[in-house]
A protein has these predicted regions:
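Short strand-connecting beta-turns/loops that link adjacent beta-strands
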Residues: 25-26, 50, 69, 95-96
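A short beta-strand-loop-beta hairpin characteristic of the jelly-roll/cupin
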Residues: 42, 48-76
Length: 108
């Protein structure tokens, strides 16, 4: 088994999407990324599949919509947990950029 090493990723420039973890040589089961959404923009409806997901809001505000008609308001310094097999979308409802970090971990 290859020994994993501690590493640091620096956010550079104005990238709208930056994968932080996802390369199996860096992490065993975690996946993570940094996302920037413009006003009224969404990440798109997607499913967590066999993974749990957490979203940590760094800037802005918006909604996490999940299931058929459910949503939770998000804003700077908030944290959202999304269970496995959950259809969801992240939407920027503010005039400011919505910046967040997502992390997923396979549980099944």
């Amino acid at each position: 088994m290859t020994k994993k090493k501690v590493f640091c990723v620096q956010f550079k420039g104005r990238q709208r999407f930056l994968r932080l973890l996802g390369d199996s040589s860096k992490a065993k089961g975690l996946r993570s990324g940094f996302v920037i959404l413009k006003s009224k923009e969404s990440i798109g409806l997607h499913n967590t599949g066999l993974s749990e997901e957490v979203i940590s809001i760094i800037n802005g505000s918006g909604l996490v919509c999940y299931g058929k008609k459910n949503s939770v308001k998000i804003k700077k310094n908030s944290f959202v947990y999304i269970p496995p097999e959950t259809l969801h979308n992240v939407i920027n409802t503010s005039k400011d950029l919505l910046k967040y970090i997502y992390t997923t971990a396979r549980v099944k």
